[in-house]
């Protein structure tokens, strides 16, 4: 079932912890030859992605509508990134299904299974892993119960990594960043084992060396 986020049976979902719920989109219809990677730029109200395309650059201003008004968000977005117009505004939830299997014949996939804001661009990797879990369940490599537990654990690891970013705040001292830093952050023991170099296993979609690079950048304690 890949019908997206709008047709969900809400009783089968849990909310994920995340400070964002809205994105404003824009685009510049000219390429930037000097931009060869996706930028993630902190703003007073959240952060913005800047994605280079072949003939354009896409922008997405992520913020919390309960903290920042749409008018203030648009004003900061267009001024900060020198944009002429807005293409779309989307509101979203961060969530995960309690069970990726519904009935005897249906596997939830894509946004029907779960969604986490794009700070670490984890969706494709998660959905590929979900295909693996579905295969393992259908062909009895593992029980569906074990497969469901594995994929939910993976989603929680992704949430923990994203929330780790927010714990360190940004250069902005604003209501949004105060709120983001105040959110519950208590990752599992595996997180600390990998982060401290005691366990050489993948966590979420990251290896031990990814953790080391992150720690070096933020003076991890």
What are these regions (language model features)?
Residues 136-221:
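Long, low-complexity C-terminal extensions of enzymes
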Residues 47, 102-106, 176-182:
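Bulky hydrophobic/aromatic packing residues
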Residues 13, 29, 37, 59-63, ...:
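Sequence-level detector for tyrosine residue identity
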Residues 54, 63-166:
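FAD/FMN-dependent oxidoreductases across multiple families
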């Amino acid at each position: 079932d890949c019908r997206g986020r709008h047709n969900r049976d809400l009783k089968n979902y849990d909310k994920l912890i995340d400070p964002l719920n809205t994105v404003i989109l824009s685009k510049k219809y000219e390429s930037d030859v000097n931009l060869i990677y996706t930028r993630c730029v902190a703003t007073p109200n959240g952060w913005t992605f800047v994605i280079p395309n072949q003939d354009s650059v896409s922008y997405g201003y992520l913020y919390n509508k309960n903290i920042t008004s749409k008018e203030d968000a648009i004003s900061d977005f267009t001024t900060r990134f020198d944009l002429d117009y807005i293409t779309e505004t989307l509101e979203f939830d961060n969530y995960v299904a309690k069970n990726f299997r519904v009935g005897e014949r249906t596997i939830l996939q894509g946004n029907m299974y779960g969604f986490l804001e794009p700070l670490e661009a984890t969706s494709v990797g998660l959905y590929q892993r979900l295909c693996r879990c579905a295969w393992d369940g259908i062909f009895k490599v593992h029980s569906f119960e074990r497969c469901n537990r594995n994929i939910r654990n993976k989603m929680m690891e992704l949430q923990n990594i994203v929330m780790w970013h927010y714990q360190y705040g940004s250069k902005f001292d604003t209501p949004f960043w105060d709120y983001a830093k105040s959110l519950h952050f208590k990752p599992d023991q595996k997180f600390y084992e990998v982060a401290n170099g005691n366990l050489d296993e993948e966590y979420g979609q990251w290896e031990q060396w990814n953790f080391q690079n992150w720690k070096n950048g933020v003076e991890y304690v």
